[in-house]
Every structure is written in C-alpha cells, then in structure tokens.
C-alpha cells in the first residue's frame, strides 16, 4: 500500500505511470505532474476506470474512502462512472451556463440574447461545455479566449472572458464552484483597447483610395469595405444587414434595434455610390442569402468579423487603418467642414446621455443627413492621387 511519503516523492517522467495502492486504487502520474487518483474495476464483464479525485486536493485516506464507496456500489450493480456522469451533468459548465442564460435573457433584447447564445454555442461550449465547472482550470479557459484572439476578434475575446466569468460567479453563488478563473486571464490576453483603433489623416486618404483600387480579392469584402466607408456604420451593423433592411426606393438602410449599441433602430440614408454598390451586390448574394454581405463558405451567415480588416491588410494598410477608423475620419472631416454636429452624431449612432445627440428618432435629421452623406461620398471619391 502507498504511503504519503511515496506519493509526495513521485515525480513526472517521460511517460505517464501508476503507483498502486490496492483493491484497484492507484495514483496516476501524467507527464504534466498533476497527480490523479483512479480506480480500476470491472462491471458487467467490462473493465472501467473511475477518476476518484485530484491529489493533493484529495488525500490518500479520502481517496481510499471514496474508492471503498465506489466498490460498494459496484457490488450491488451500480456503475460509479455512469453515476458520476449523471451527477455531474448538472454541474457541467454547459448546464450552469444554460441556467445563467435563462435567468439573464429576461433583461436582454432578443437580438442580444441570440448573439450571445451563438457565441457560446459556436466557440465556448464545444471546448469546455462538457467539463465539470469546478474542475475547469485557467489554462482551459484561456484556450477558449485564444481562439478568438487568433482570428483577431479582440473585442469578442474580451466579451467571452467577461461572460464566462459571470457563469462562474453564478456557479459560486449556487454552491457548485469555489473559484472564478476569468478575472485572472486579463493579464494573459493580448488586450482590446477601444480607443486605439488606427485611422488616417485626411492627407493620406488619396493614397488609401489608390491602394484600395488595386484589391483583387473577394468582391463581397471589397464592397463591404467601400459601403462601410460611405456610411460610417460600425462593422457589426454592416455585417448584420439583410436585404430586407435595404430600401432602394426610399434610399435608406434600416439597422435593427437588436444590433445597435443603443438598442434603438438606426436609419441610414444611401448615397448614389452606396446604391450603385448594393445594386451590383444584389445580383451576387441576394439569390443565395438573406444577408447583404453573405459569407463565402456559409451563405446562411454574414462575412466574418475581420473581412474588412483583411482587405485593409491585403492593400498594405495593416495597423494604419481600420473599420472604426473610417468612422473617426468621417466625424473629423465632417466637423471640420461644419456640418451640423447633431446630424453627424445621429449618423454615427452615438448616445451621449440625455442630450439631443442621444435621441434615436429614426427620422431625425434625415433630410440633412441625405445631403451630408452624399457630400461625404463625393468627397471620398474626389480624393484620388
């Protein structure tokens, strides 16, 4: 039988190994050095292994006691692995997330709740959903965050960390976890700084236009980039656009309230340039997708969140320009040319407290904004070197 001294002296080797205690119980020592108590047993003629607990969280005596209980269950036909799985289903990250989500979605808009559920279903639950929440370690959660960062989705990485943290806090207050690893990951993240999006000064816009004219990649991504510049929309708002949101007759794009940062409808007047671009695109994506900017591989989804950044990168402006930079340039130049500040703010869908700039009446300043957005599109087109 094992002694505490033998257990403490056990060091990781090039290959995993076991230290036998007796009656099927042993200490498993993997290459990582994280020791685990396991019990080998037979039931219904099949050999199985039960993970009893982690050392040193579970002492030698506690492991023996738990193994004894498991063997007692086996003697009356109860499979401890199946019993543990049934018990842990309610303590898995996925199960607790669903409880938390059902509780929180009551105060969210339908659009936001749908967006968040998609983020968890696509990128988080497939990795850690099946794990018991109390067993999830910081490195496992960091793996989730790294997947967002690796594709350049820094804002979404930060959102994923925060929302996972809320799930862990919910587990803690409901007695199913003792530790929230999410806050500790902040220093390990590449970071998302909202105020540091690159943008171009006005005198560099002609050179950018010339570079953009050389782009030979996806026509959908190219038109998305141009429309983003002409409209000063947020990338998220642009990607959400469906053909039902585009009214060619009245020359407006309507962005659903569920997508907007302020959760209120946003109406965007279309310049001649935008109408021409979307008319061209309608023959490409409208027959196959409800999305204006349909994804390349999955027409049921919009283009990826980094599509515009990839265009910018391909024409040599990585780190110098960005989708958010287009909005900054629009705001700066329109203010310099003394267009009405409130019309500019409404076009940008900026909410500033209780002031007039925070009022999202979809008809507000529409006539003035029609004139303003046509001027802006013409100004951009004239800047050719």
UniProtKB/Swiss-Prot annotation:
The keyword DNA-binding applies. Residues 91-172 form the Core-binding (CB) domain. Coiled coil: none annotated. GO terms for molecular function: DNA binding; hydrolase activity; transferase activity. The keyword NADP does not apply. InterPro entries: CB, DNA_brk_join_enz, Integrase-like_cat_sf, Integrase_catalytic, Integrase_DNA-bd_sf, Integrase_DNA_bind_dom, Integrase_recombinase_N, Phage_int_M. CDD domains: INT_P4_C (cd00801). Its EC number is 2.7.7.-, 3.1.-.-. The active site is at residues 234, 261, 324, 327, 350, 360. It holds the Pfam family Phage_int_M. GO terms for biological process: DNA integration; DNA recombination; establishment of integrated proviral latency; symbiont entry into host cell; viral genome integration into host DNA. Keywords: DNA integration, DNA recombination, DNA-binding, Hydrolase, Transferase, Viral genome integration, Virus entry into host cell. Integrase is necessary for integration of the phage into the host genome by site-specific recombination. In conjunction with excisionase, integrase is also necessary for excision of the prophage from the host genome. Belongs to the 'phage' integrase family. This is Integrase.
